[in-house]
Amino acid sequence: MNARGLGSQLKDSIPVTELSASGPFESHDLLRKGFSCVKNELLPSHPLELSEKNFQLNQDKMNFSTLRNIQGLFAPLKLQMEFKAVQQVQRLPFLPSSNLSLDILRGNDETIGFEDILNDPSQSELMGEPHLMVEYKLGLL
């Protein structure tokens, strides 16, 4: 055995990172890096995609700031409390909900959009056994 000891032998050895493959054809090392998630690496496909995803949130913020400037702090707080109360009221899990009261609060009850035509609950793909859905929602399963 060398007089310098085991620690110096480890220092003199080639680092593992130099032995690993690098470049465009490198395989993903699951043991060191874990599972790769492609969803996190995707960029928006179009510049307007992010704007469209956040449209309702931005619209609500703009309405709240306008209300605050015109009527004071009470009006947006009251409207936000009404939004929370309306969002908590739901039907049973197997029944479709139109959220009409939320549409009325936002002023969307007088507009017709593509979701009004293409979002028919009778054509939903997520139909299930009503008793199982209620038991799952209540945490009995």
UniProtKB/Swiss-Prot annotation:
**Residue runs in coiled coils:** none
Which Gene Ontology BP annotations are present?
A: proteasome assembly
Q: Specify where it is mainly localized.
A: cytoplasm
GO annotation, cellular component aspect: cytoplasm; cytosol; endoplasmic reticulum; membrane; nuclear speck; nucleus
Q: Does the keyword Ubl conjugation apply?
A: yes
Q: Where in the cell is it found?
A: Cytoplasm, Cytosol; Nucleus; Microsome membrane
Q: Where is this cross-link: Glycyl lysine isopeptide (Lys-Gly) (interchain with G-Cter in SUMO2)?
A: K39
Which top-level group of life is the source organism from?
Eukaryota
Would I find Membrane among this entry's keywords? yes
Which keywords label this protein? Chaperone, Cytoplasm, Endoplasmic reticulum, Isopeptide bond, Membrane, Microsome, Nucleus, Ubl conjugation
Quote the Pfam families the UniProt record gives: UMP1 (PF05348)
Indicate the family of this protein: Belongs to the POMP/UMP1 family.
Task: Output the PANTHER family linked to this UniProt entry.
Answer: PROTEASOME MATURATION PROTEIN (PTHR12828:SF3), PROTEASOME MATURATION PROTEIN UMP1 (PTHR12828)
Role noted for this protein = Molecular chaperone essential for the assembly of standard proteasomes and immunoproteasomes. Degraded after completion of proteasome maturation. Mediates the association of 20S preproteasome with the endoplasmic reticulum.
Tell me the subunit arrangement.
Constituent of preproteasomes, but not of mature 20S proteasomes. Within the preproteasome, may directly interact with PSMB1/beta6, PSMB4/beta7, PSMB5/beta5, PSMB6/beta1 and PSMB9/beta1i. Interaction with PSMB8/beta5i is controversial. Forms tetramers.
- Could you tell me what this protein is called? Proteasome maturation protein
